[in-house]
């Protein structure tokens, strides 16, 4: 798994606008996805847009959303031809319909691919994901579908956004910081950090 971090700091060190750092981050992502596929890695999860990113300046958020749109429009067909399956995790509630449609289309186009599973964490926050899982489990208990005594770590895992996706073996944070930033808190219980 990769926390895509440090784009703004990278740009600032070079006297460039933050937007240049974000563009360079997308280029690095392309290289990482290709390398993962070339090395036979089956799953790669990227933290592309945190649910906390909405608090950034509006112009930066708008630029990041435009980058996402461009990436999907320009890269998804090539990823599909390369056998990459795209799965998006995170909340789609309150996203503009155009973004939701692009995410849905990318998943639909690539759903039968199996060379590399690219999991894109977009509008993702792990605490919110865990809260959604707890809410789903509570509803199952309330409806009688599940008893409280049956709740286990496996039941929780099966109700997360990442249900069915293996926990990461390795977590890389590209910006050099040493924090997890509300990313895959449950899933990283036994993950190595770099």
Residue positions per predicted region:
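Flexible, compositionally biased loop and terminal segments
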Residues: 1-194
């Amino acid at each position: 798994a990769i926390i895509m971090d440090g784009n703004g700091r990278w740009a600032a060190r070079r006297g460039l606008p933050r937007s240049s750092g974000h563009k360079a981050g997308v280029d690095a992502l392309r290289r990482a996805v290709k390398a993962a596929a070339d090395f036979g890695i089956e799953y790669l999860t990227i933290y592309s847009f945190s649910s906390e990113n909405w608090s950034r300046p509006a112009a930066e958020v708008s630029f990041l959303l435009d980058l996402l749109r461009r990436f999907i429009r320009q890269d998804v067909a090539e990823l599909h031809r390369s056998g990459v399956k795209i799965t998006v995790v995170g909340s789609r509630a309150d996203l503009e319909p155009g973004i939701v449609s692009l995410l849905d289309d990318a998943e639909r186009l690539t759903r039968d691919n199996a060379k590399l599973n690219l999991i894109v964490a977009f509008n993702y926050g792990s605490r919110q994901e865990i809260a959604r899982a707890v809410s789903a489990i509570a509803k199952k208990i309330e409806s009688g579908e599940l008893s409280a005594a049956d709740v286990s770590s496996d039941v929780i895992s099966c109700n997360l956004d990442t249900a069915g996706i293996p926990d990461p073996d390795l977590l890389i944070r590209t910006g050099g910081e040493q924090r997890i930033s509300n990313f895959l808190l449950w899933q990283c219980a036994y993950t190595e950090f770099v």
